[in-house]
Amino acid sequence: MVQKFQSPVRVYKYPFELVMKAYERRFPKCPQMPIVLDCDVIKIESLENGAKTNTTRRCKLAVDAPYIFKKLIGVDFVYFLQHNYLDMSNRTLSIEAVNESFSSRIEIFERCRYYAHPDNAEWTCFDQTATLDIKNFFGFEHSMEKMGMKQYTQTTLKGKEIIEYFINQLEQEGVTHVDRWVPPLDAAKSPTPEQKQHHDILLDGDFIARNLGQLSPMQESKLLELRKMLDGVDDLERVPSYQTILRFLSARDWHVSQAFAMLCDSLQWRKEHRMDSLLEEYTEPAVVVEHFPGGWHHHDKDGRPIYILRLGHMDVKGLLKSLGMEGLLRLALHICEEGIQKINESAERLDKPVLNWSLLVDLEGLSMRHLWRPGIKALLYIIETVERNYPETMGRVLVVRAPRVFPIAWTIVSAFIDEHTRSKFLFYGPDCEHMKDGLAQYIDEEIVPDFLGGPCKTMIHEGGLVPKTLYKANSLEDHDDDVTIVSPGAGAATATASAEASLAPVALAPMKRLSANHQHDHQNLYKSVDLKPGFSHELLIRNEDPKSVLTWDFDVMRNDLHFTLYRVTQELPEKNDDAVSYFDLQDFVEGTNYFREEPTLICRHKESVQGSHVMHHNDSYLMHWFSPSGAQLNLFYEVLSSVNYKGSMTSLQSAFSSNSSAASSVQSR
């Protein structure tokens, strides 16, 4: 099997002529490359008045292999033939090397190129490819492949170091400039027409240091490669900035083709939705001005603009019903556009690279009411849209005052956030200002917000409930009962899903929806339960995972009912008849073999109730609904594994209590 190797393009920030002067010092051998024992020039020819020089060398290389392997093959060194084709007029050097030893058993071919940087004549590029084809090598084919890969990696890494070493050596000797080759005065002019220079992208070191930060040579080259690919897009109105190109490359782990596809999709999206005009055309609706708890607040220690979002004070349901999905998305996109603008302003003001902004999320007041189903779906849709079109604009996310319900919210939402973005989240408990490695590590103490105990007042609204008078006439309020239902024992009966349909804004219809494996489609999740007067509905959950979390969400569709959560210590039988209650069992006594874990909650008609409970014990848990006058509810529950609360969630476990958050969620019903 042929093994192929491709190095990234490396950039020397020195002229081609100086790099060639340094390259010559590698021969016949140098201590920086001990594997090369010697090189003999066996042929050299000069062409076109010295403009071109072709050199063939026979190089003796040490076998970098275990002693026993060298004894088996019977050699301590091997020979390679190297052919150099130097063209000083066009400022290129092509190198081809093939193995002379064992050529009938192994074929090794390496091609390297040095050439003047196409966009900066004072720089030199280098790239390298190689193939390894082992036909038959005494039964050691696999070992040879591994050694070949290792050797290629080592020589690739050392190559640039050696050139840099000899350039520094030349500088110490006073050689910092080598004149370009010019033809002799009496030389006949070449009939070859002068090549038209069409490279107009100038990217110098000062620009990179000032605007993009420290990039590796490979990253610089890929940046230019993607920039050139964009030049070939016919219907592109304007080429994005280098900062934007850099963000998309970083988001796709520096895979140029993937970044190109992602960026082209985003540019088309921006064109379709007039995103370049959003900052000029957008006017904040009154409900945002009066009830949205978010805004910009100074800069962090790295110069990033800070956006504060007091999520725990946000009425998610009220904002969504007032703005609609399109309005909420436009608000989020406007914040992103403002962020880009403030990033550029900060970079210009500080005269240093600033490529993203920071988000400070205050979760005080967060409860299960924030996990309202349409609100979660809207949030996931916004996350997907932002990640597709504003990658790598978020530098750091500081999550403060995280309550006990936060791990549940994080479990749901984090799966939809890019892994690299998730790594930027930092979580803090209540004492986020004074704890070790607290906010002061990232934000100057004088600008810590007053609601966190700092001295700086913010201009951010407190949030609070949105008055229903601001709800849209066709908001989700009119469709609270339109949910997808599965009737127990009767198969799936699908009700109208107008609440779901209303989340697809017409103006943003061309946007790609959530991928199939990431959709939070609530179809078939909820069961419809009819409670006859004086009867109860019970669900028994046998817990074998201590510290797992039981979550529930139900809508009261007709009349009032009572809800209680119990913990049961005795083994209970399976129940086949809904008319029979576990509480009818003999010797089933509260405080002896069952315990009330959550106080009884009276749930009113048309209320939506969400709650959670950490199941600390390896017992059974009994969810109990009772209605004196008969009722109907649409019910969903889920058990979240304890593994969801390890790692970054560990510090939050101490904030858990046995009380349900359902009481606080009732406020938003």
From Swiss-Prot:
Residues 284-460 form the CRAL-TRIO domain. Residues 522-641 form the GOLD domain. Pfam families: CRAL_TRIO (PF00650), CRAL_TRIO_N (PF03765), PRELI (PF04707). Transmembrane segments: none annotated. One of its GO terms (cellular component) is mitochondrion. Residues 3-175 form the PRELI/MSF1 domain. Its main location: mitochondrion. It is found in: Mitochondrion. Signal peptide: none annotated. The keyword Mitochondrion applies. The keyword Lipid metabolism does not apply. Keywords: Mitochondrion. This is Protein real-time. It comes from Drosophila pseudoobscura pseudoobscura (Fruit fly). The lineage of its organism: Eukaryota, Metazoa, Ecdysozoa, Arthropoda, Hexapoda.
